[in-house]
Structure formats: structure tokens, C-alpha cells
């Protein structure tokens, strides 16, 4: 069925940090859609002439935006949103990790999976890169719930073998088997993708990181995501655990985990050298405004990332973040960058870009989602 949607249309088919003309806005716009694919986007009157026999859904008084894209969010942390007053490692120890141990119960995990996907959809998020659970069946429940909702999700089993609660630990051999199990389960689902996810370098031994490397080498369709440079204490701990590494990024690089399909969350305290190497390797950064503010982690050095042509998008980081709203994260980008060490003003076009196409570019999905270019 072909349909012409009439409403105000806003989207950014170009990088709004690179082009002043990136924002496409049409007060009386139209979007021609056929079987989920965009045929045309533009002025309603012109499209009505071009498609005279197509049925019209008149949404005058409303506006249409591309689906939002969340590049960093934790499925098992839905019910701990709002745990304020902590720094990162204390928050993990007191709130996040105790809650995540509950996902050993498949029934509990299935309940939260439904809450999670409804939370995404209710806030306009149609695509997300998601930290799954430490448990296979819980992560499978997330994939099933996302599929039933029609969301586009990249996720995977969260891997750790040290420094967390024992219940959350795996072994390299078990991680290898469990990841293959989940990859096979979602292989026939076009809107589901798999990410290799060591929780962060602190919680991953060299043998576990070798497993991550082997998984990525074996299957080029997989993504990689983890945390980096989120808090000063975290960085100090990584330095003590990997004394051979010149910086945090070097840990992931030594195991060949940083490439075009890699998304590194936070990067608040990155060195210029790390940002430059992220650019060279084609990786992306997930910028999590509300979480970094709520946990007192710091303000993302956006200007330094832009100066080095590093790719970045936004993530809500539920539950360190304060909710599912990607537009709220984009607004926070404007507010916090005014207060940054090297301040800058984020325009409305750039905010919309961060909430939509930037995430699509980070996930190499910009040929299918992120804006209203015909064919998407």
C-alpha cells in the first residue's frame, strides 16, 4: 500500500556540524511511503501533483521526525533510573550490579524486556545499540521483545570475568559458546544485530578480550561496544590492570576491537591522541549527556572531537541516565556545551542530527534509517 503523509517535516540528511544547510524543514510537507519504504519527501502540494491517486493521511498540525537512535543504553537498568548522588563505580556497586544479578531469572528478564522496548517506542526511539544482560536467556528475551515491537536493535551478552559480583562473571570458554548461541538465534531476523560487549576493560581479563577479538574476526557483521574514559577512577583502575597500555583506548586496540563497527561509550576524559586514533580507525563515540552529569563524570569534550573529525552520536545510558528521551539528551548537549571548558553553541539542526542521522552513521545504518531520503 502506498500512502502520502501530510504534516510538517523535519530531518537532517547531512551532517549538521559540517553543513549549514543540513536541516530540511517543510511546514506543509509530505512523505510518500510504500510498504515501509520512503518513495519521496518534500512539499505536500508538489507531491500531491506527482502522486495524484495515492491515498492521503492528513496529519496537519502534527510534525514528523525520523525515528530516534540511541547508541548507548542498558536493558537491565530500567528500574534503577533516578539513583542520584553517586559517582560511577559506587553507583555500579550499590545499584546497577545488584539489579543486574536479578536477570538470572528468565521470568523477571522477560518482564523488564517488555518494559524496556515499550520505553524506547514511547519516546520515539526506533533503533538502539543496547547493552544486554550477563545472562543468555535474559538477552534472548530482549531480542524477542524488540522483534515483536518491530524495533531495530543491536545488542549482545555482556561479558565480564573479574571485579564484578561472582553471579555476573563468565569464563572465556563459556563466553565463546554463549555468544555463538545468541548469534545463531537472531541470524534470521533482519532488524536484529549482534554486538560483542565486554562490560569495560576493568572487568575483562586478557583471555576474555581474546575471545572478543576472535568473535569479531570470525564474523564481520558483528559490532563492538564497551565503555571508555567515563570517570577518573575508572581510568586509574584500567591503568593499574593494564600497565603496558599507553592509555585506555590502547587496551581495546591491542585486541583489535576498535574499528568501523565499534561504538565506545562516554570518552569524557579522552586524550587528544585517543580521539585522533578513534578517528583513524573509523570508530564512533556514544555521548551520554544526562548520565555523565548525573554521576558527576564530567562534560564531553565535543569541540575536541569535532576538531579531530571523530564521529559521535548520543545515548541515554539508562539507568545511569535519567530516562529514554533522546531529544532530552540532544537538548542537554546544548546546555552542557555552553558550560564546557571549550564552550560551543549547538544549533537545533545539530541537536536533531545527533538524535537521528548521527546514530545511523555510527551504526553504519545511514543507508536505511536516520532521515527521510527516498529509498530508506
Regions found by a protein language model. Give the residues of each.
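Histidine/acidic-residue-rich catalytic or RNA/ligand-binding cores of hydrolases
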Residues: 232-243, 274-279, 296-305, 322-338
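Metal-coordinating catalytic core of metallo-dependent amide/deamination hydrolases
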Residues: 137-267
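N-terminal metal-binding scaffold of metallo-dependent hydrolase/deaminase domains
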Residues: 1-50, 62-63
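Active-site gating loops and adjacent loop-to-helix segments of metal-dependent hydrolytic enzymes
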Residues: 79-109, 157, 162-172, 231-259, ...
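His/Asp/Glu-enriched, well-ordered alpha-helical/loop segment
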Residues: 254-261, 303-376
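Alpha-helical scaffold segments that flank or form the walls of functional sites
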Residues: 32, 82-151, 175-188
Amino acid at each position: 500500500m502506498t500512502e502520502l503523509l501530510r504534516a510538517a517535516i523535519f530531518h537532517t540528511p547531512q551532517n549538521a556540524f559540517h553543513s549549514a544547510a543540513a536541516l530540511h524543514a517543510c511546514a506543509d510537507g509530505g512523505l510518500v511511503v510504500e510498504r515501509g519504504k520512503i518513495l519521496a519527501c518534500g512539499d505536500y502540494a508538489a507531491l500531491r501533483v506527482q502522486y495524484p491517486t495515492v491515498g492521503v493521511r492528513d496529519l496537519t498540525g502534527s510534525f514528523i521526525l525520523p525515528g530516534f537512535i540511541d547508541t548507548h543504553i542498558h536493558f537491565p537498568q530500567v528500574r534503577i533510573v533516578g539513583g542520584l548522588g553517586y559517582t560511577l563505580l559506587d553507583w555500579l556497586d550499590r545499584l546497577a550490579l545488584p539489579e543486574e544479578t536479578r536477570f538470572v531469572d528468565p521470568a523477571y528478564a522477560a518482564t523488564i524486556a517488555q518494559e524496556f522496548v515499550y520505553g524506547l517506542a514511547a519516546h520515539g526511539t526506533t533503533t538502539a545499540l543496547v547493552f544486554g544482560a550477563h545472562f543468555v536467556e535474559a538477552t534472548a528475551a530482549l531480542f524477542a521483545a524488540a522483534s515483536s515491537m518491530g524495533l531495530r536493535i543491536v545488542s549482545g551478552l555482556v561479558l565480564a570475568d573479574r571485579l564484578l559480583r561472582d553471579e555476573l562473571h563468565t569464563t572465556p570458554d563459556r563466553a565463546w559458546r554463549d555468544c555463538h548461541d545468541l548469534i545463531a538465534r537472531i541470524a534470521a531476523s533482519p532488524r536484529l544485530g549482534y554486538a560483542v560487549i565486554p562490560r569495560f576493560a576493568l572487568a575483562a581479563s586478557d583471555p576474555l578480550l581474546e575471545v572478543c577479538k576472535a568473535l569479531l574476526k570470525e564474523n564481520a557483521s558483528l559490532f563492538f561496544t564497551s565503555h571508555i574514559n567515563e570517570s577518573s577512577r575508572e581510568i586509574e583502575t584500567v591503568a593499574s590492570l593494564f600497565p603496558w597500555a599507553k592509555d585506555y583506548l590502547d587496551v581495546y586496540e591491542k585486541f583489535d576491537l576498535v574499528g568501523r563497527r565499534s561504538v565506545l561509550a562516554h570518552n569524557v576524559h579522552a586524550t587528544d591522541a585517543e580521539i585522533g586514533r578513534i578517528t583513524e580507525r573509523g570508530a564512533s563515540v556514544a555521548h551520554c549527556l544526562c548520565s555523565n552529569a548525573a554521576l558527576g563524570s564530567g562534560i564531553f569534550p565535543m569541540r575536541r572531537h569535532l576538531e579531530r573529525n571523530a564521529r559521535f552520536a548520543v545515548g541515554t545510558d539508562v539507568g545511569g541516565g535519567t530516562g529514554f528521551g533522546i531529544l532530552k539528551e540532544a537538548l542537554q548537549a546544548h546546555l552542557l556545551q555552553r558550560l564546557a571548558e571549550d564552550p560551543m553553541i549547538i544549533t537545533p539542526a545539530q541537536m536533531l542530527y545527533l538524535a537521528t542521522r548521527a546514530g545511523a552513521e555510527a551504526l553504519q545504518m545511514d543507508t536505511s534509517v536516520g532521515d527521510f531520503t527516498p529509498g530508506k
